[in-house]
Design a protein with these regions (language model features):
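Short, Lys/Arg-enriched N-terminal segment that forms or immediately precedes the first helix
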Residues: 8-19
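Helix-turn-helix
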Residues: 41-68
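A short secondary-structure junction motif
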Residues: 80, 84, 113, 131, ...
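Amphipathic alpha-helical packing segments from all-alpha helical-bundle domains
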Residues: 97, 124-166
Length: 228
């Protein structure tokens, strides 16, 4: 049975929260599918409207432009990842175990959760891998950062960095390591699929176990902790 999970996202990203209406959820569902199919550059609100049997104007009632829609989708994904880490580390005392769970969640969040009917996290993850940098490698990034567009990503990264500090309070680069783990997961999946000479891992049949192993080796190696 499908359930409704309401993600609290920055209100400046949208004109009307798409999670609140059937049409809005349909916009989210099909924008994910369409961006995955044709890419963000080719994606337009007109093409989306045609796909959902609505009008371009109806999409503009929710989002000012497709850039904000992309940021919204990424924030939804990052918030879902944070929820996954929170849930899976609940009542865990061993910080090393928490970091392994967090790393697993970074990878596992990419897998489809059939309980959320309007978001296919597996497809959304492909968008994160291929398109995420287009959300914040822009001329407007400083203003958008001041407006809190990327707070969800920063909170997620801080959660991981706090676990790293819990393991080793003297480690000097917890924030850098946390953000690197998040980016590394996406980068090496992309490399494995499209630029294999840039990575040592392979991704076949949706098996991301090598990605998880890479993140563990990298993180625990820098923290001088032997994996068992």
């Amino acid at each position: 049975m499908a359930i409704t999970i309401q993600m609290k996202l920055n209100e400046q990203l949208y004109l009307k929260d798409p999670q609140d209406t059937r049409l809005g959820r349909k916009i989210i569902q099909h924008s994910i599918l369409l961006i995955d199919e044709i890419g963000f550059e080719a994606f337009t609100f007109k093409k989306l409207a045609d796909q959902i049997g609505s009008t371009e104007a109806s999409v503009y009632r929710y989002f000012t432009n497709k850039h904000l829609l992309l940021v919204y989708l990424l924030c939804w994904y990052w918030e879902w990842m944070k929820f996954s880490i929170d849930y899976n580390t609940m009542n865990i005392e061993d910080a090393r175990k928490k970091l392994r769970i967090a790393i697993s969640s970074i990878v596992d969040t990419t897998r489809r959760n059939t309980s959320i009917e309007f978001v296919d996290e597996d497809v959304l993850h492909r968008i994160v891998v291929a398109e995420a940098t287009k959300a914040y490698h822009t001329k407007e990034v400083d203003k958008e950062n001041r407006d809190g567009f990327f707070m969800t990503y920063k909170v997620l990264s801080k959660k991981i960095s706090d676990i790293i500090t819990e393991i080793d309070p003297n480690y000097p680069y917890p924030r850098a390591l946390a953000s690197t783990l998040l980016e590394m997961a996406n980068n090496h999946i992309y490399f494995a699929l499209h630029l294999p000479a840039l990575t040592d891992i392979t991704v076949e049949g949706g098996d991301l176990s090598q990605v998880e192993k890479l993140l563990e080796d990298f993180a625990f190696g820098l923290l001088n902790i032997e994996l068992k």
